[in-house]
Amino acid sequence: LDWIRKPEEPAGAAGRPLTLLSGQRLTLGQFSRDKAVLVYFWGSWCGVCRYQSPIIDDLAADGVPVVGVAVRSGSSAEVAAYMAKRGLGFPTVNDEDGGLARSWRIVATPAVVLVKNGKMVHYTTGISSYWGLRARIFQADVFG
């Protein structure tokens, strides 16, 4: 089903500033210059995301560059409270109205997009294992 749900990198995505819940601003172009970045589209309302998010958090804790995108999950305070309650610490952008996800043509969550040097090099939807994602990240770093 991934080929049906394939996201599309929006024009200018590499240079578009993103603001994390922490207030830090970054661009995917800068953040993905040296290593592939895992961009994780998820929602607090998404049942499958409740299983995927701890895996993403483990990857981030192990040094994988991660940017979460909380899609239509409430205010920034609500997203931060949701993450704190579940012990999730990966950097996250609040996509309160879903506009960022729409610009990437994300039609299902959870969705993982790997970005290297500002370009999308891999994507998948649904649940993925820690080691499955690690393998994709390695592949993106070496061949991306």
Q: What role is predicted for each listed range?
A:
Residues 38-39, 66, 112:
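Hydrophobic beta-strand anchors of alpha/beta hydrolase catalytic cores
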Residues 27-50, 56:
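Short active-site neighborhood of thiol/selenol oxidoreductases, capturing the structured segment around
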Residues 1-17, 144:
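N-terminal targeting signals for export/organelle localization
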Residues 17-18, 114:
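Hydrophobic beta-strand positions
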Residues 84-89, 96-144:
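Thiol/disulfide oxidoreductase modules built on the thioredoxin-like
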Residues 50-86, 96-102:
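Structural microenvironment flanking redox-active thiols in thiol-disulfide oxidoreductases
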Residues 12, 35, 107-109:
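Short, small/polar residue-rich loop motifs at catalytic or cofactor-binding pockets
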